[in-house]
């Protein structure tokens, strides 16, 4: 999410809005949003309904979490682009921006992803911290 935080102004300049969805409880999501300084909305899907409906549910990790995914949805709700990824391979914002800026002819590349040490520490803290 940090990469998308860093690209948020470019995403907005392209006329798009960014919303993230987490299966974490609201208090955990609020803490993560503060810790990462996320300028975009972080919605909570604690019953995992949305992640199941969008086919990104991963029941094998931490009692069921969402796989990393990016969806570009038009204002008329048509899906322009989707990428459902693995933890170590994802589409980066720099590769999504051309889709937002043009008529959708670009297709982003996936990159190997290695979370930063601070990201690991925050994730572990969120797992062990109550509420």
Describe the function of each predicted region.
Residues 1-131:
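Chalcogenol-based redox active-site neighborhoods
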């Amino acid at each position: 999410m940090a990469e998308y935080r860093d690209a948020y102004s470019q995403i907005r300049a392209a006329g798009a809005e960014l919303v993230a969805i987490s299966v974490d409880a609201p208090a955990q999501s609020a803490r993560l949003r503060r810790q990462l300084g996320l300028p975009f909305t972080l919605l909570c899907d604690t019953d995992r309904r949305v992640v199941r409906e969008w086919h990104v549910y991963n029941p094998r990790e931490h009692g069921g979490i969402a796989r990393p995914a990016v969806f570009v949805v038009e204002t008329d709700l048509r899906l322009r682009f989707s990428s459902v990824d693995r933890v170590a391979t994802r589409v980066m914002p720099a590769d999504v921006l051309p889709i937002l800026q043009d008529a959708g002819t670009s297709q982003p590349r996936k990159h190997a992803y290695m979370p930063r040490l601070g990201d690991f520490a925050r994730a572990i803290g969120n797992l062990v911290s109550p509420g």
